[in-house]
Amino acid sequence: MTEAQRHQILLDMLAQLGFVTVENVIERLGISPATARRDINKLDESGKLKKVRNGAEAITQQRPRWTPMNLHQAQNHDEKVRIAKAASQLVNPGESVVINCGSTAFLLGREMCGKPVQIITNYLPLANYLIDQEHDSVIIMGGQYNKSQSITLSPQGSENSLYAGHWMFTSGKGLTADGLYKTDMLTAMAEQKMLSVVGKLVALVDSSKIGERAGMLFSRADQIAMLITGKNANPQVLQQLEAQGVSILRV
């Protein structure tokens, strides 16, 4: 067996198990302890595994986190672009919109930029973009900066209730007949305070999340005026939502 063949088998073991000991490698490949350690060292140096005490660990490849600079890497990017374009068509000149955080939110803000609408947001990447593009009317909701979500969050019972928009556009990690789910509790609670003062709540949810439950229930289905999603969304869930008065737009 060649060195390259040994390395491939070792990597296959890690892909399946996540961790192997030197003894595992010796037994599987029928090689000496010195050869097993040498193989692990070489693969560690080449960045293909992580050497640990008495063995090796697989290296988890994380999906790059999207930013406005690499927006094309956002999951289901093309569908989200269609969703954002459709959402922007709902808003009339002179109206105000609340746009929250996330890749779809940024895409929607980009579609709205330059139009005669007031944009209310706590999402700093979007706010910075709108200011840089000299959008006429931008309101940035104040509060403490949350690094993980790049947003500002206000204390409970703060002045967020003053920011009433004709429309509120938001996304989530899942949507079922029960309603819209979000995984970040602080973000969800901050947005929930605005539900009673906005005109219409529109959920922007790509088709992969329809039928999924993830995190906390942010809003009941009967609180959602409209859902904009992709054409591959679960039809059974869409029927259940329509039965509760939710308008469905598939793009």
UniProtKB/Swiss-Prot annotation:
Gene Ontology biological process terms, A to Z: negative regulation of DNA-templated transcription; regulation of DNA-templated transcription
Compartment(s) of residence: Cytoplasm
Keyword Metal-binding among record annotations: no
Keywords: Cytoplasm, DNA-binding, Repressor, Transcription, Transcription regulation
SUPFAM superfamilies: NagB/RpiA/CoA transferase-like, Winged helix' DNA-binding domain
GO cellular component term, pick one: cytoplasm
DNA-binding region(s), chain positions: 20-39
Occurrences of domain HTH deoR-type (ranges): 3-58
MF-aspect GO terms: cis-regulatory region sequence-specific DNA binding; ligand-modulated transcription factor activity
Annotated function: Represses ulaG and the ulaABCDEF operon.
Entries under NCBIfam families matching the protein: PRK13509.1
UniProt protein name: HTH-type transcriptional regulator UlaR
UniProt organism field: Salmonella typhimurium (strain LT2 / SGSC1412 / ATCC 700720)
Organism phylogeny: Bacteria, Pseudomonadati, Pseudomonadota, Gammaproteobacteria, Enterobacterales
Underlying gene: ulaR
